[in-house]
Amino acid sequence: MSTVTLSSGYEMPVIGLGLWRLEKDELKEVILNAIKIGYRHFDCAAHYKSEADVGEALAEAFKTGLVKREELFITTKIWNSDHGHVVEACKNSLEKLQIDYLDLYLVHYPMPTKHNAIGKTASLLGEDKVLDIDVTISLQQTWEGMEKTVSLGLVRSIGLSNYELFLTRDCLAYSKIKPAVSQFETHPYFQRDSLVKFCMKHGVLPTAHTPLGGAAANKDMFGSVSPLDDPVLNDVAKKYGKSVAQICLRWGIQRKTAVIPKSSKIQRLKENLEVLEFQLSDEDMQLIYSIDRKYRTSLPSKTWGLDVYA
């Protein structure tokens, strides 16, 4: 598995398996199969409500000798409602995952909300049916909590998720331990070149969630526009004898982002790893750069009642 060295000094595999919205009854089998075919990076979150199930799969993998803990890279994320309780939330995730440390801990959204209980990950709405944001906690305070998880030995690397450029800049300014990773939506239809280049310039690894666009997974949630249907990408895929999804992932890796695709199907899991076995030409990379639509598919405003990217 190809890796990249983070600013923290640790190695992170450039392809991870995203575990969002995987069904609980299939999660264990998916993780074990993924490990068997070569996956070493798993992307979790408290909000996915599956950390305990992931923990059971990891425990079995370790017990049976399928893989050693030090061979895996485990990421999880703190939810909005726990910004004021970072260390406690981290320990809660570790307990569920049945591991002693996290390889990477991310702030899921730059948006503290009303706390209810550690690890419960509620998104409480106010009387106006709008997400109840906690204005008493600053993102700097949240980051200080993240830094404490490192000093306590709970976490090796810390980072951001769904942060825009200027919030990333602010974190770089006030942090004592710099964010090693910034995970955000990016794919051929939403390339975010300025954010990608800014992160790379300042030693933050850009990591693509939703690297295929979201329509293939859930059209009701993400809309029907998908780069997988794009004629340019389909032509490139035919040229290389690959799937459009493989072209999207390979493009992401060649622009020096890590990618976190999601799948539960063993054949697609294998195909996703195969993107490490070929390269796109410079001409085809530029061709894909030309199809950017600035089309964001991940829109929490649909359930939270406000545009969190405003």
Swiss-Prot record:
Substrate binds at residue 108. The active site is at residue 48. Keywords: NADP, Oxidoreductase. NADP(+) binds at residues 210-272. Its EC number is 1.1.1.200. Signal peptide: none annotated. It is an enzyme of class 1 (oxidoreductase). It catalyses: D-sorbitol 6-phosphate + NADP(+) = aldehydo-D-glucose 6-phosphate + NADPH + H(+). The keyword Chloroplast does not apply. GO terms for molecular function: aldo-keto reductase (NADPH) activity; aldose-6-phosphate reductase (NADPH) activity. SUPFAM superfamilies: NAD(P)-linked oxidoreductase. The keyword Oxidoreductase applies. The record marks 77 as: Lowers pKa of active site Tyr. PANTHER family: 2,5-DIKETO-D-GLUCONIC ACID REDUCTASE, NADP-DEPENDENT OXIDOREDUCTASE DOMAIN-CONTAINING PROTEIN. Belongs to the aldo/keto reductase family. Synthesizes sorbitol-6-phosphate, a key intermediate in the synthesis of sorbitol which is a major photosynthetic product in many members of the Rosaceae family. This is NADP-dependent D-sorbitol-6-phosphate dehydrogenase. The gene is S6PDH.
